[in-house]
Amino acid sequence: MQTAPTGGAMIAIEATETEIRDTLPTHHGHLDIAAVNTPHSTVITGDHDAAHQLATTWRNNGRRTKQLNVSHAFHSPHMDNILNDFHTTAATLTYHTPTIPIISNLTGQPATTEQLTNPHYWVQHLRHTVRFNDGIHHLHHHNVTTYIELGP
């Protein structure tokens, strides 16, 4: 992680994933969606200036925004140059079959043992959108009322 480029930003915006996705092309690949936390809370990630420009647009339209206190623009192209090294490190770990069900933040669905014990899965997790809202929706649909979130 230390070799990932600095200078990025992550900002939570009171907007749907679709609303945010519709505005991303105007930023020419400098931004991506880091996380979909709720139906109306989406986190953007990428270049600092582009992220703040987009957040200002949403704020000027009456939406709440909050910059996240992070060291890097995770889940964005800023991570691309460390993915190979991350995979190399992840491949040295010993993985075990989970003893409790785990919902994947990549899919919002139950993760398989094959996924959770594969270094490539964790590389994807570093780079792609966190589908937290989809996971909560899946749990709710299956009448789960108690959750444990594990993260950094």
Model-derived regions: residue spans:
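Acyltransferase
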Residues: M1-L150
